A protein has these predicted regions:
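Extended, low-hydrophobicity acidic Ser/Pro/Thr-rich
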Residues: 8-10
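Extracytosolic ligand-binding ectodomains
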Residues: 1-6, 17-375
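N-terminal signal peptide c-region/cleavage motif recognized by signal peptidases
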Residues: 13-15
Length: 375
């Protein structure tokens, strides 16, 4: 027979246990394939956020809440991305952080929308992503229109380039970025002397670059990933092409110097990263980067802090709604003002970040060096 006091204690313990809940938040990115380093970097950012949140005393839906990260691999493949999205819907996740690139985020977004599950991408830049009319779709970085435009204007107005040759990898990301660069460069008075296309798995660009060489462009613009940019830079050097090399956030990584080897020279590469913090506001971001390096033993690749902020923003909306139910916290997410390590996060009616910054970088001594922050 259980003593009365013990029975009461057991009852209280059981009651407290029943009042706990596990809230599943997913992160999706390429953990395998040519841009696995980007996916792993973002996943690390999500894990840091989850671990910090679980150290706090958070109550949602009247229950003590523990957050669980469901980390999934889409291999940067649209078909795998949609399969993963359906898996997460079936698992009844409360929200999704991801995907990493536009080619996976866009097809997956329809599945999340149909299920009413909020999705915040920390790195998708295709303008199309937030132009589908989905109220569940958000991003915490600037889009390709802003990225490509900034690069085109910089080429014309700061580099004083007159001509450019353009190559894109035909992905939603690469094509969109190249189109925006061409539009801005032409508007600023530049001439596009050649346009060529490849794919996101290619590493041999000799035929394309040989055709470019005859045109003598001031700038070679690449709408693609660092996995392609590295070999392209090596082949440009071998062919004696002296042009500046420009591209977007997917080439603007800490891995580019390793991928390019001796093909990259000081100040040759100009790239733009969606996001950026002015010097006056860098204290929180620098602290995050230090904490990341202590935890993982390496520097961030590019978007880990934006992934961290995306997840923290989602949970902030849950806390404001006092619920992890997507129907209840989605309205709070749409009107959120969250101070993140990358700056203030709030969204416009489409789900784009308001006042998204863009940072331009070059490389010197195999290290990325900031040129300017613009909007």
């Amino acid at each position: 027979m259980i003593p009365l006091a013990a029975a009461a204690a057991l009852s209280l313990s059981t009651s407290a246990y029943a009042q706990e809940q596990a809230v599943k938040i997913a992160h999706v990115g390429p953990i395998t394939g040519p841009i696995a380093h980007l996916g792993k970097d973002n996943e690390n950012g999500a894990r840091m956020a989850i671990e910090e949140l679980n150290k706090q005393d958070i109550t949602l839906d009247g229950k003590k809440t523990r957050f669980v990260l469901m980390a999934e691999d889409d291999a940067s493949d649209p078909k795998q991305a949609t399969a993963v999205a359906q898996k997460l819907v079936d698992a009844k996740v409360a929200g999704v952080i991801g995907h990493v690139n536009s080619g996976t985020s866009i097809p997956a977004s329809k599945i999340y929308y149909d299920a009413g599950i909020p999705q915040i991408s920390p790195s998708t830049t295709s303008a199309k992503y937030t132009q589908q009319g989905f109220n569940t779709t958000f991003r915490v970085v600037a889009n390709d229109s802003q990225l490509g435009g900034a690069l085109g204007r910089y080429a014309a107005n700061t580099l004083h380039a007159k001509t450019a040759a353009v190559i894109d990898d035909r992905t939603a990301y690469g094509q969109g970025l190249a189109e925006e660069f061409i539009k801005a460069a032409k508007a600023a008075g530049m001439t596009i002397v050649a346009t060529q296309y490849t794919n996101d798995k290619a590493t041999d660009f000799n035929a394309i670059l040989t055709s470019f060489k005859a045109k003598k462009p001031d700038v070679v613009f690449f709408g693609g990933l660092d996995a392609g940019a590295g070999p392209m830079l090596r082949q440009m050097k071998q062919l004696g092409i002296q042009a500046k090399f420009m591209g977007g956030d997917a080439i603007c990584t800490s891995d580019l110097p390793k991928l390019a080897g001796d093909g990259i020279s000081n100040d040759q590469v100009i790239c733009a990263e969606a996001g950026g913090v002015e010097e006056s506001g860098r204290k929180a971001l620098d602290a995050y980067k230090t904490a990341y390096k202590i935890k993982y033993g390496k520097d961030i690749v590019i978007y880990a802090p934006y992934t961290y902020d995306a997840l923290m923003t989602m949970v902030d909306a849950m806390q404001k709604a006092k619920s992890a139910d997507p129907k209840k916290y989605l309205p709070e997410l749409a009107k959120i003002h969250h101070q993140g390590v990358t700056g203030m996060i709030s969204f416009d009616a489409k789900g784009d970040i308001r006042d998204g910054s863009i940072t331009l970088y070059t490389y010197r001594g195999a290290q990325r060096s900031q040129l300017t922050v613009t909007k």
